[in-house]
Amino acid sequence: MHFLSPAKLNLFLQILGRREDDFHEIVTRYQAIAFGDQLSLSISSRDSLQVINACHLETPSNSIWKSVALFRRYTGITTPVSWRVVKQIPVGAGLAGGSSNAATALFALNQIFKTGLSDEEMRSLAEQLGVDTPFFFSTGAALGVARGEKIIALEESVSDRYVLYFSSEGVLTSRAFAAVQPSDCSSRKNLEYTQNDLEKPVFRLRLDLKEKKHWLESLWAELPVYIGLTGSGATLFVRYPEILEKDLSYAAQIQRAVTLSGGLLTSPIRRDPTAWYSIYSESALAAT
């Protein structure tokens, strides 16, 4: 069985302050995108994991094995399984690669063993696997509140396009939040839903990302776009309404900016509640 494990963007992320448990209270807008890893699952004689493009992730601490352990405890099914992952999402990129793998693995196990777990059950289990893991059991667009793990589904679809800019070095989420100062936080009375409050602390840690954003702002200056960091980084992204591509002048400028900047152009993706995210046909995935 083959599954897309999609990346996510934080279209905005606002920090409301530090909680009594020492974590930060946030509100964020999650969006799944048509870019991600490919997971394949089969029943086997022994447990195994192969990660193409990132063999250093073939460890017992991989988020996929955490999903397997949780699934086995919950269902009592202990049949060995074999995983093959074609890794595309960079580590420490703010794209939730590990969380997406964990969620996709949980969904895949439910499918292959026909255990009939509901989305609500899997979402509840996913809260034990990571802050943004539950999001992937939404339709692909949601608000995240509390630490980001409490999901409020959004039914409206967005007609945006995104251009992703990866970094050769990731950012640890824990390090980014540890660098947050009170002045970085948003006022509860003046939430703008257009910014990422983690940008300032991350840019203090990573001057190269701040400079990269300035470079992108100059490159895209003549177009009505938003440029920001997703999550705690290190990925920067450009967001613009898809309708711009229908204007020949704008379309040419967009193509030029994407080409000159070396960005990866992608789109939002939605999930049918009865299925999983997909931008690939089953035959195409089987051929990889």
Curated annotation (Swiss-Prot):
SUPFAM superfamilies noted in UniProt: GHMP Kinase, C-terminal domain (SSF55060), Ribosomal protein S5 domain 2-like (SSF54211)
Record organism: Chlamydia trachomatis serovar A (strain ATCC VR-571B / DSM 19440 / HAR-13)
Family of this protein: Belongs to the GHMP kinase family. IspE subfamily.
GO molecular function: 4-(cytidine 5'-diphospho)-2-C-methyl-D-erythritol kinase activity; ATP binding
Biochemical pathway: Isoprenoid biosynthesis; isopentenyl diphosphate biosynthesis via DXP pathway; isopentenyl diphosphate from 1-deoxy-D-xylulose 5-phosphate: step 3/6
Swiss-Prot/TrEMBL catalytic activity: 4-CDP-2-C-methyl-D-erythritol + ATP = 4-CDP-2-C-methyl-D-erythritol 2-phosphate + ADP + H(+)
Active-site residue numbers: K8, D132
GO biological process, one term: terpenoid biosynthetic process
UniProt cross-references to HAMAP family, sorted A to Z: IspE
Keyword terms: ATP-binding, Isoprene biosynthesis, Kinase, Nucleotide-binding, Transferase
Role played: Catalyzes the phosphorylation of the position 2 hydroxy group of 4-diphosphocytidyl-2C-methyl-D-erythritol.
The keyword Nucleotide-binding is assigned to this record: yes
Identification of the protein by name: 4-diphosphocytidyl-2-C-methyl-D-erythritol kinase
Binding-site list for ATP: P90, V91, G92, A93, G94, L95, A96, G97, G98, S99, S100
EC number(s) on file: 2.7.1.148
Domain of life: Bacteria
Broad enzyme group: transferase
